[in-house]
Amino acid sequence: METFILSSDSDDDCPPPPKRRSIEGVPKSFDGDKKMRFSFDVTRDIILEDSEAPCSSNNIFTPSFRRDSNKTLLKTPVSLRRRSRSMNCMTPIVDTINEPPINQVCSAFVQKEIQLDDDDDDEKESSTEHADDDLNLRALLSPEKKKRKEKVDKRRPFGVEEVQNEFYGVYCLISRSERQCYKNRCYIGYTVDPNRRIMQHNGGRFKGGAKKTDSRGPWDMVCVVHGFPNHVAALRFEWAWQNPAVSKSLKEKQLKKERKETPFAYQLRIACELMNSEAFSRFALTFRWLNTKEELPFPISCTPPNHVKLRYGKVKKEMSLVPAKSADYVAMGECRLCGKDIEKLWGLVRCISQSCHSHFHSKCLAEHGLKNKNEYADQIYPLKSNCPICGHFYLWGDVVREQRRIIKVSTKCAEEFRNKVVRKDLPHREISSRLRLKK
């Protein structure tokens, strides 16, 4: 069997180099290949010695080479025939896709709904013509998202607006886990709704609970300190309660847990120290026991301040009604101390007594309270004082809380009542939590 042996780097006249490997089945000349990668899809015809194979456009991958007349062309091995051809001159065959016009992509369905034909025949013809287009357009148009239905409180009267009174509290939890390493541990947190927050902690992280309380419960919310003027003050109290060794208010006292002191008794002592500190002692705070079974006496060395209220039971949401009648609003009027008109609603405060209807400038009432307590040179606002008109005792924190409720109602009321003050004798609605028991 005759073979044609030639190196791909050699010329026709020159013999191949002595130490260069020759490849069987590789043609000698690449003149007709147009500098493309050689393909082994060769023909089986016998080519004369002096003739050259024509290179046509239809057969650009068929190599042209010269061979001896006495030699026959060797059949290309199967392993070499499987190699790919050059991709330089190959054009991909792509099926044409009938895409809809741009102006019909987003408006085809809209136009079909708007244009109403009078004749039934025209409607049938248009439906058959656009039947194929509709199938293609359905993949291009995104489905419409269903709007979530707004939750309506069934306990609220229909058509009556309400605003929730502000609540900022810092609570303490106790673990009831059966595992000894987690039992009786305490956790300090901040919340605006204690009834909802305790369910989140017992539900785990997927229900909104904290990382440190996940799979370490069940937890009991024992007590909560509330009455802060805003969320910033409450968060500062929470951080100081969690980090007594680093807090500016307590780091000088170096509070440490005693040997026979329980974890909750230690946390209660820290809370009492914070309520007596300079940063929080002038707030109208309330200490509430949520679980009376865990009630402990306050430490003798640091009892809460006298103005701090002590309460028992669960926290209830208070909702203030937004009245729609003009009879439920009163004019701002003039200040009962300076006699000048009150121009802005945010500068108005009033006595918290139900029988007194006096309005004051916030600056005037604060100066009056500071002068009575001889604190005008040291403080900005009084801790507690008496109304100059009726003599009713008040805490400044309660006065500010009432002012914020008035402003909150004014943002929800009608435009004609924006510069008026809502009456204080309107009823408030309390919402008690409904805990879902597991079956």
From Swiss-Prot:
Keywords: DNA damage, DNA recombination, DNA repair, Endonuclease, Hydrolase, Metal-binding, Nuclease, Nucleus, Zinc, Zinc-finger. Residues 125-136 have a biased composition (Basic and acidic residues). Residues 1-28, 117-140 are annotated as: Disordered. It is found in: Nucleus. Signal peptide: none annotated. Its EC number is 3.1.-.-. The keyword Amino-acid biosynthesis does not apply. A zinc finger (SLX1-type) spans 335-390. GO terms for molecular function: 5'-flap endonuclease activity; crossover junction DNA endonuclease activity; zinc ion binding. Belongs to the SLX1 family. Both the N- and C-terminal regions are required for interaction with him-18. This is Structure-specific endonuclease subunit SLX1 homolog. It comes from Caenorhabditis briggsae.
